[in-house]
Amino acid sequence: LDSVVDTHSMFFTNAPQEELAKHLFELSDGHFARSLFFSSGSEAIEGALKLARQFHVERGEPQRVNVISRQKSYHGNTMGALSLSDASRGPLFSPYVVPARQIPAYFPYRDQQADESEDDYALRCADALEAAVLDLGAETVSAFFVETVVGSSLGVVPTPPVYLERIREICDQYGVLLVFDEVMCG
C-alpha cells in the first residue's frame, strides 16, 4: 500500500494495484474476479451509485431509481454520497442531492427498548428496510447502502450479524443491491 500511485483506474494500472487486487481475489475464495479502486470513500460511494444504476438498466429494470440508507449515516462529501448521508446533514444542499429514503439506524444506546433483546431490536431495525422497500414499490428500489460499523456519526457502533443476515434476505427477496460502506471501519 505504501507504493500505490493514484492513477485513474479506468485506463491505467500499476503493479502494486494489481498485486492488491490479486490478494483480495484470493481472500474472497473465488467470489470476486474484478476490482475497481478509488481515491476516497466518497468516490467509492459515487461509483457504487453509478454501478447500481447501470446494473439495473442492463437488466431491463430502468425504473429502479430509489436508494435507501440509514438515519445518522455518513457516506461521504460528494453530492451522491451526501444524498445517502443523514438528511439532517445537508439542508443547504438539498436542491442538489438525489432524494434517498432513510430508515432508522441501528443505535441500541438510544433506541433499544428496555424489554427488547439485542436480536429483537436488530430485527426491528432491519425490518424497517422491508417496510421502506414496499412503501416505495419494490420494483423501483435500486440499492440499500449501509455502514457495517457506523464510525463518524454514532461513535463506532458495530452492526450485529442477525441484522446483516436479515437485510441480506430482504435485498435478495426484492432484487435490491446491498452496498456495504466499509471505508471507515477497515
Where are these regions (language model features)?
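Glycine-rich loop-to-alpha-helix module at the N-terminal edge of alpha/beta enzyme cores
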Residues: L1-P62, G76
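Acidic, glycine-rich active-site loops and adjacent beta-strand->loop/helix elements
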Residues: N14-A15, S42, Q71-Y74, V150, ...
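Buried hydrophobic positions in well-ordered alpha/beta secondary-structure cores of metabolic enzymes
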Residues: L24, A48, V67, I103, ...
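A glycine- and small-aliphatic-rich helix-loop capping segment at beta-alpha/alpha-beta transitions
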Residues: R53-R59, L82-P91, V162-R166
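PLP-dependent aminotransferase-class I/II
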Residues: Q71-V149, P158
